[in-house]
Every structure is written in structure tokens, then in C-alpha cells.
């Protein structure tokens, strides 16, 4: 608060973090070897080498400068779409690389790739240890996790055992547009008793249930 407009800010930087983030590891691997890390062990090994090198560079800069350089697994929802549009203008639509509306966030296995939850967790887990400025991994459940607590617990334990530092389980939540009920609706709304056969469609609202 006492810093003037012409004062040096070098000392202030020592109290913060200088993070480098990245997106699109999956597309990078597709461009380099034709497979992403969800598709082969070879791609996973290369992915860990790439992210490991970025972390090494951050550690080296920290040692050289005494500043807190860190590596961030960026959840860049807006940037992932903006960057791919820029690259499409330059390189066109390259299959598996720039042919979608977005790049995959950070080190994530692409959301369009069919993969078991446990396998996705095991692939992404090692990257959490490399990204010391922040990271998150998601998996999705088909329905209400309270109806299958064993599966939910198995996912959480798998995250723990795989080194996931910050994990999230996504599941669908329905909204009845007539009575406004929010929750899991099977065939009958728990609040008003209305069924989908009454010519009103329910609206699906995604909700995220975060688990440390």
C-alpha cells in the first residue's frame, strides 16, 4: 500500500508466485506422434517428459532468481477456444489437433475420448505432482452418486491412490421447468409428481461436486 508510482516492485514479487500455465497437452501429443496420452503408453511417457521439462525449467528459474516460479495446469475455459481459433486461421483444421472448437485443458485426457474413470484418473495422476501451481482432474458419473456410494467411494480412493491432488466428480442434476425442483428426477418429479409424459421436457443442468 505504501508503494509509490515510481518505486521499484522487485521486492514485492518475492511475496507472490510467477506461474506458467499450459493447455493442449493432448493435442500436442497428437501432433507429435499421432496419439494422445489416453491412447498409448508411448504418448503418456512423452507427455510426462514434456510437462516434467516445463516443471524443471520453473525450478531452475526459482533457483536462479530466488523468486517463486511454478507450473500451472491451466483450466482455461475461454482461452482454449480462443487459441484454437487463432491456430485454425494459420494452420487450418488438422485432424486431432485443431479440428475442434477448443483445446483440451492442461494435461487432461480429451473429454470426447471414451475411457473408464479409473483409467483416466491413473493417467492424469502423475501430472499433479509436476504442476505445483495448481491442478484438477474430473470424472463423470451417469446418475445420482448417492444411489451408488460404493462406486463413488471407489472413485475417490482411486484418486487418492493415483496421486490426484484436487479431484472432482461431476454428475447430472435435473430441473423441472414447471415447479422449479432441482435434483435427480427419474420418471416422476419428487416435488410436484409430474411425469415427462405430460408434454414437458426437463432441463438438464450440469453440476460439479468437488472432492479434495
What are these regions (language model features)?
Residues 1-212:
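Long, C-terminal-biased catalytic regions of enzyme "large/alpha" subunits
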Amino acid at each position: 500500500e505504501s508503494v509509490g508510482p515510481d518505486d521499484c516492485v522487485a521486492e514485492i514479487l518475492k511475496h507472490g508466485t510467477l506461474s506458467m500455465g499450459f493447455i493442449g497437452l493432448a493435442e500436442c501429443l497428437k501432433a507429435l506422434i499421432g496419439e494422445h496420452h489416453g491412447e498409448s503408453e508411448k504418448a503418456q511417457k512423452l507427455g510426462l517428459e514434456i510437462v516434467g521439462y516445463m516443471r524443471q525449467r520453473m525450478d531452475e528459474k526459482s533457483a536462479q532468481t530466488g523468486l517463486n516460479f511454478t507450473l500451472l495446469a491451466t483450466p482455461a475455459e475461454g482461452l482454449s477456444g480462443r487459441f484454437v481459433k487463432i491456430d485454425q486461421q494459420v494452420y487450418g483444421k488438422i485432424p486431432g489437433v485443431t479440428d475442434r472448437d477448443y483445446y483440451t485443458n492442461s494435461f487432461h485426457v480429451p473429454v470426447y475420448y471414451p475411457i473408464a474413470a479409473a483409467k483416466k484418473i491413473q493417467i492424469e495422476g502423475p501430472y499433479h505432482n509436476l504442476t505445483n501451481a495448481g491442478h484438477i482432474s474430473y470424472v463423470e458419473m451417469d446418475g445420482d452418486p448417492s444411489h451408488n456410494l460404493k462406486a463413488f467411494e471407489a472413485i475417490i480412493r482411486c484418486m487418492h491412490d493415483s496421486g490426484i491432488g484436487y479431484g472432482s466428480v461431476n454428475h447430472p442434476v435435473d430441473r423441472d421447468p414447471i415447479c422449479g425442483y432441482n435434483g435427480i428426477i427419474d420418471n416422476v418429479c419428487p416435488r410436484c409428481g409430474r411425469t415427462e409424459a405430460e408434454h414437458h421436457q426437463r432441463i438438464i443442468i450440469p453440476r460439479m461436486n468437488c472432492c479434495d
